[in-house]
Amino acid sequence: MTAFVIFNPNSAGGQTGQDWREIEEALERVFPLMSFFVTAAPAQAAHMVRDALRDGHMEIIAVGGNGTINEALNGFFDRGASVCPDATFSFVHSGHDSALCRKFGLLPGWRAGIAHLRQAQVRKVDVARVSCLSESGVPVSRYFLGAASFGLSGTIARSLGTARIARFFGHRFALGWHRMAALLQWRTCRVRLIASGYDEIAGISSVKLSPFGGLLDVEVSAGETRRRVLKSMKSAGRRLRSARLTAAPTLDTSGPVAVETDGESAGVLPATFEVHAGALNLRV
């Protein structure tokens, strides 16, 4: 088989780049004919995947962390439409922990990821799209495969994306550090949520959305006070399912409400989330 591989050497604190020769040799045993692109800046992966699909490549593999995988996924779409509906996407997560891997029953780490590709099957999966605002107020849209969220989790993702602490102390330590910092700075966040048969103004700590079965699984975690935020982090919130969710902060919410997709900062509310059923061929 042939494949176009998007590779981020800086993922996993630079360990992916150090292991590149081993990764290349392991991939070649599965895909004897490959083309490679090494990312050097944010957003490059999406542009290169889009160009590769238009050039006729039918198998795209992303090797890296959450950001690389999400960027590559976004390259499959342009202006709300699929660039090449018959193309196949797969990913090799090079980190030590991944919610995306857990969703699809995969082990993190490049060795486990490539080993799984040897017997992986292609199936249609749902993706979702969020339309929101950038930090500067410009409309943006992002596709996601695993999950998106806004509120406290979005703030944590935004902080992680701009900090260098993970490179020196590891992702797990950095996540705990930024989670604590975000919680200490947390202020009441009230958001209007509109979905199928649901319209409510709620005090939230975070709202998580994941595409599954043609709908969005939505979990709303309460957060009127810091004590309630701590409690919500230890228990499941209210759940609903809808093909679409619109969220907008109320006037008494201080500061922007951050949005993240697959662990990467995407923008701020207001936002609309919608599912695209069976929109991607995923080798998993």
Regions found by a protein language model. Give the residues of each.
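Short, solvent-exposed amphipathic alpha-helical segments in soluble enzyme
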Residues: W20-E22, L53, F77-D78, G161-T162, ...
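Short, active-site-adjacent cap segments at secondary-structure transitions
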Residues: T68-N70, A99
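A residue-level signal for conserved active-site and pocket-lining positions in enzyme catalytic cores
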Residues: N8, N66, A128, I156, ...
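ATP/NTP phosphate-donor binding region
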Residues: M1-V63, N70, N74, R111, ...
